């Protein structure tokens, strides 16, 4: 099994966390990819309106895909630096692997940008979880962990270089036939680690202010709880066939 974490070293707290977490849950065999988007602007398309942070994130994912291809891995688990993997992640992945086909992506964590519907028709059961197709590709959002096949990795590398789309623009990648099928695992087996401060560079004055403020900490904790609850209620499951249920392999 191949596991690659996306984490820029300049975000020290997050980088240290995911390194410890993967050593504990996954084992010693993993990689960490992190590209600083503030010095990688040349790699973004002139027509892109992405922020430097989004460019760096996208480039980090592309670097992970290159590693998957170079190592000739059939698939890989890509994790964000705030992911919390379950203790049985290896068992889950063995069962996910049995369902994979060329060009597949499987989100083990999904934060839809809005209320989204997913189909239970022909959903694949994996223990207490189900693999479901979206009713619309826009229902697929940011993901703290996802499985990607080598063919999908190759497709996204072709579609997003130079970088024009954020790392989690699944609809964009599907439209360009970079991904042939995308499913979500429900409920999410992967959760999010709550950090004391928002995503700001190490050494940032704003980061130090937020992290050191006792008044702001309860607000941040409440905000995280609100977002988690909102995410849990954003997915609706319907007994209707997904329009993406007959997608052909690449």
Label each region the model flagged.
Residues 1-79, 83-250:
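An acidic/histidine-cluster motif and surrounding catalytic segment
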